[in-house]
Amino acid sequence: MAPLELYAAPLLLLFCQFANEWCVGGWLPLFLVQRLGISPATSLLMLAEFWSALLIGRVLAQLIMPRVKHSRILLSSVAASFLGCIILIATNSRFGAAAGILLVGAGFAPVYPLVVEKIGARFPYYHPGFFNGIFSFAVTGGLLSPFLLGYVAEHYDIRVVMGWPLIGSGMVFVLLICIWIESKLSAPPVGRVP
């Protein structure tokens, strides 16, 4: 397998995941102010709620990953982020926004640790500089997506700010499934020594 084929899916997955997180992190306060009429100070507190949910979720994900099947973590993560984005798109209240923000933050949280674990297992003998390239590309997704979202939001409604991560979460889910299928198909049969 060519090197690009080996790491294309994890690379795209991290690109999309960083784009999702940074879109919400960058646009959430403006979304709350324009969509719900929440004060700028309160919207910044709600942004802190998002980052707190993401941080606490990542710590909890590290604790439960050895004990819970990764597919269950993934399905729960995707369901939470989908539901959170849908709630944020549809809500008219501060309570709905807070619930959606918690679900989005908690839903995004386990994806990064799951992918990093997969990348480490897939490329155990690679130089650390290789991983630097992967994560630099991922950060590029986090930088480009909020920038592009500004142009999209200008031409459409501010609700697109939460629709974008909804679509991105679907892409992350599909890419994670592809990575797991590929790892199952390329694994040596049980009982045989490679």
Label each residue range with its predicted role.
Residues 57-69, 153-154:
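Helix-to-loop junctions at the C-terminal end of transmembrane segments
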Residues 162-179:
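Symmetry-related core transmembrane helices of the 12-TM Major Facilitator Superfamily/SLC fold
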Residues 51-59, 142-143:
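Residue-level signature of mid-helix packing/kink "hotspots" within the transmembrane helices
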Residues 109-123:
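Intracellular juxtamembrane helix-capping segments at the cytosolic ends
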Residues 84, 95-103:
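Paired small-residue
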Residues 4-48, 55-56:
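Extracytoplasmic gate region of multi-pass secondary transporters
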Residues 72-87:
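Structural signature of the two symmetry-related core transmembrane helices
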Residues 124-158, 165:
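A late C-terminal transmembrane helix in Major Facilitator Superfamily
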